[in-house]
UniProtKB/Swiss-Prot annotation:
Disordered, as annotated region: 76-97
Subcellular location as annotated: Nucleus
Protein keywords: DNA-binding, Isopeptide bond, Nucleus, Phosphoprotein, Repressor, Transcription, Transcription regulation, Ubl conjugation
Record lineage: Eukaryota, Metazoa, Chordata, Craniata, Vertebrata
Record protein name field: Cyclic AMP-dependent transcription factor ATF-3
Positions carrying Phosphothreonine: T162
Biological process per Gene Ontology, one example term: regulation of transcription by RNA polymerase II
InterPro entries: AP-1, bZIP, bZIP_sf
Amino acid sequence: MMLQHPGQVSASEVSASAFVPCLSPPGSLVFEDFANLTPFVKEELRLAIQSKHLCHRMSSALDSVTVSGRPLEMSVTKAEVAPEEDERKKRRRERNKIAAAKCRNKKKEKTECLQKESEKLESVNAELKAQIEELKNEKQHLIYMLNLHRPTCIVRAQNGRTPEDERNLFIQQIKEGTLQS
Protein backbone atom coordinates (compact mmCIF):
# COMPACT_ATOMS: atom_id res chain seq x y z
CA MET A 1 0.00 0.00 0.00
CA MET A 2 3.07 2.27 -0.02
CA LEU A 3 3.11 5.11 -2.49
CA GLN A 4 6.04 5.11 -4.88
CA HIS A 5 7.74 8.49 -5.31
CA PRO A 6 10.08 9.20 -8.19
CA GLY A 7 13.60 9.98 -7.11
CA GLN A 8 15.12 9.84 -3.66
CA VAL A 9 12.81 10.47 -0.71
CA SER A 10 14.06 11.69 2.65
CA ALA A 11 12.61 10.39 5.89
CA SER A 12 10.95 13.71 6.69
CA GLU A 13 8.96 13.51 3.46
CA VAL A 14 7.55 10.10 4.33
CA SER A 15 4.37 10.41 6.37
CA ALA A 16 1.89 7.99 7.79
CA SER A 17 -0.57 9.01 5.09
CA ALA A 18 1.74 7.43 2.55
CA PHE A 19 1.23 4.12 4.29
CA VAL A 20 -2.32 4.54 5.57
CA PRO A 21 -4.65 6.53 3.36
CA CYS A 22 -7.52 7.77 5.49
CA LEU A 23 -10.76 9.21 4.18
CA SER A 24 -12.00 10.53 7.53
CA PRO A 25 -10.58 13.61 9.24
CA PRO A 26 -8.43 12.82 12.30
CA GLY A 27 -10.40 12.27 15.48
CA SER A 28 -13.72 11.75 13.72
CA LEU A 29 -13.75 7.96 14.15
CA VAL A 30 -15.32 6.46 17.25
CA PHE A 31 -15.15 2.98 18.76
CA GLU A 32 -18.51 1.97 17.28
CA ASP A 33 -17.01 2.43 13.80
CA PHE A 34 -14.55 -0.36 14.56
CA ALA A 35 -16.89 -2.66 16.48
CA ASN A 36 -18.59 -4.18 13.41
CA LEU A 37 -15.52 -4.64 11.19
CA THR A 38 -14.82 -7.99 9.64
CA PRO A 39 -11.64 -9.87 10.58
CA PHE A 40 -10.15 -9.09 7.17
CA VAL A 41 -10.64 -5.35 7.65
CA LYS A 42 -9.31 -5.61 11.20
CA GLU A 43 -6.19 -7.32 9.89
CA GLU A 44 -5.72 -4.56 7.30
CA LEU A 45 -6.05 -1.93 10.03
CA ARG A 46 -3.58 -3.77 12.25
CA LEU A 47 -1.07 -3.90 9.42
CA ALA A 48 -1.65 -0.21 8.67
CA ILE A 49 -0.99 0.70 12.30
CA GLN A 50 2.17 -1.41 12.28
CA SER A 51 3.28 0.32 9.09
CA LYS A 52 2.69 3.70 10.72
CA HIS A 53 4.81 2.68 13.72
CA LEU A 54 7.53 1.44 11.39
CA CYS A 55 7.40 4.71 9.46
CA HIS A 56 7.98 6.70 12.66
CA ARG A 57 10.85 4.41 13.64
CA MET A 58 12.38 4.68 10.19
CA SER A 59 12.12 8.45 10.09
CA SER A 60 13.71 8.83 13.52
CA ALA A 61 16.43 6.33 12.60
CA LEU A 62 17.11 8.03 9.27
CA ASP A 63 17.28 11.45 10.92
CA SER A 64 19.78 10.29 13.52
CA VAL A 65 21.95 7.87 11.52
CA THR A 66 24.19 9.00 8.69
CA VAL A 67 27.11 7.25 7.09
CA SER A 68 29.74 9.44 5.29
CA GLY A 69 27.39 12.39 5.15
CA ARG A 70 24.46 10.62 3.52
CA PRO A 71 21.44 8.86 5.05
CA LEU A 72 21.71 5.15 5.70
CA GLU A 73 18.99 3.20 3.95
CA MET A 74 17.32 0.71 6.24
CA SER A 75 15.21 -2.14 5.07
CA VAL A 76 12.49 -3.06 7.51
CA THR A 77 11.93 -6.76 7.35
CA LYS A 78 9.42 -8.99 8.95
CA ALA A 79 12.18 -10.44 11.13
CA GLU A 80 12.67 -7.07 12.89
CA VAL A 81 9.04 -6.82 13.91
CA ALA A 82 8.41 -10.53 14.36
CA PRO A 83 10.01 -11.04 17.81
CA GLU A 84 7.80 -8.40 19.43
CA GLU A 85 4.75 -9.61 17.56
CA ASP A 86 5.51 -13.25 18.32
CA GLU A 87 6.02 -12.47 22.00
CA ARG A 88 2.69 -10.63 22.11
CA LYS A 89 0.98 -13.54 20.37
CA LYS A 90 2.57 -16.03 22.76
CA ARG A 91 1.42 -14.05 25.79
CA ARG A 92 -2.06 -13.72 24.36
CA ARG A 93 -2.24 -17.45 23.57
CA GLU A 94 -1.02 -18.27 27.07
CA ARG A 95 -3.67 -16.02 28.63
CA ASN A 96 -6.28 -17.56 26.34
CA LYS A 97 -5.21 -21.09 27.35
CA ILE A 98 -5.47 -20.15 31.02
CA ALA A 99 -8.89 -18.56 30.52
CA ALA A 100 -10.13 -21.57 28.52
CA ALA A 101 -8.89 -24.00 31.19
CA LYS A 102 -10.55 -21.90 33.89
CA CYS A 103 -13.81 -21.88 31.91
CA ARG A 104 -13.66 -25.66 31.41
CA ASN A 105 -12.99 -26.20 35.11
CA LYS A 106 -15.92 -23.97 36.11
CA LYS A 107 -18.19 -25.82 33.68
CA LYS A 108 -17.00 -29.18 35.03
CA GLU A 109 -17.55 -28.07 38.65
CA LYS A 110 -21.02 -26.78 37.80
CA THR A 111 -21.89 -30.07 36.06
CA GLU A 112 -20.63 -32.08 39.04
CA CYS A 113 -22.60 -29.89 41.45
CA LEU A 114 -25.77 -30.31 39.40
CA GLN A 115 -25.19 -34.07 39.21
CA LYS A 116 -24.82 -34.31 43.00
CA GLU A 117 -27.94 -32.21 43.52
CA SER A 118 -29.86 -34.40 41.05
CA GLU A 119 -28.78 -37.58 42.86
CA LYS A 120 -29.74 -36.05 46.21
CA LEU A 121 -33.18 -35.04 44.93
CA GLU A 122 -33.73 -38.50 43.42
CA SER A 123 -32.94 -40.17 46.75
CA VAL A 124 -35.27 -37.76 48.59
CA ASN A 125 -37.95 -38.52 46.01
CA ALA A 126 -37.50 -42.28 46.51
CA GLU A 127 -37.73 -41.85 50.30
CA LEU A 128 -40.92 -39.79 49.95
CA LYS A 129 -42.48 -42.40 47.65
CA ALA A 130 -41.65 -45.12 50.17
CA GLN A 131 -43.18 -43.00 52.93
CA ILE A 132 -46.34 -42.53 50.83
CA GLU A 133 -46.63 -46.31 50.42
CA GLU A 134 -46.19 -46.83 54.16
CA LEU A 135 -48.89 -44.25 54.91
CA LYS A 136 -51.28 -45.87 52.40
CA ASN A 137 -50.73 -49.27 54.03
CA GLU A 138 -51.25 -47.78 57.49
CA LYS A 139 -54.46 -46.09 56.32
CA GLN A 140 -55.82 -49.37 54.92
CA HIS A 141 -54.92 -51.18 58.13
CA LEU A 142 -56.66 -48.51 60.25
CA ILE A 143 -59.78 -48.64 58.08
CA TYR A 144 -59.80 -52.42 58.43
CA MET A 145 -59.44 -52.18 62.22
CA LEU A 146 -62.18 -49.55 62.39
CA ASN A 147 -64.54 -51.67 60.34
CA LEU A 148 -63.85 -54.69 62.53
CA HIS A 149 -64.72 -52.61 65.56
CA ARG A 150 -67.91 -51.03 64.18
CA PRO A 151 -70.31 -53.95 64.67
CA THR A 152 -69.40 -54.19 68.34
CA CYS A 153 -69.22 -50.47 68.98
CA ILE A 154 -71.73 -49.40 71.65
CA VAL A 155 -71.68 -45.74 70.61
CA ARG A 156 -72.87 -46.56 67.12
CA ALA A 157 -75.55 -48.92 68.33
CA GLN A 158 -76.94 -46.14 70.47
CA ASN A 159 -77.14 -43.86 67.43
CA GLY A 160 -79.65 -46.19 65.86
CA ARG A 161 -77.45 -47.89 63.28
CA THR A 162 -77.88 -51.55 62.67
CA PRO A 163 -75.15 -54.08 61.84
CA GLU A 164 -76.52 -54.10 58.28
CA ASP A 165 -75.83 -50.34 58.05
CA GLU A 166 -72.33 -50.96 59.39
CA ARG A 167 -71.69 -53.65 56.77
CA ASN A 168 -72.82 -51.37 53.94
CA LEU A 169 -70.61 -48.59 55.31
CA PHE A 170 -67.70 -51.03 55.46
CA ILE A 171 -68.22 -52.07 51.81
CA GLN A 172 -68.51 -48.43 50.77
CA GLN A 173 -65.23 -47.55 52.49
CA ILE A 174 -63.46 -50.47 50.86
CA LYS A 175 -64.67 -49.31 47.45
CA GLU A 176 -63.54 -45.75 48.18
CA GLY A 177 -60.17 -47.02 49.36
CA THR A 178 -59.59 -48.98 46.16
CA LEU A 179 -60.71 -46.05 44.02
CA GLN A 180 -58.29 -43.69 45.75
CA SER A 181 -55.33 -46.07 45.49
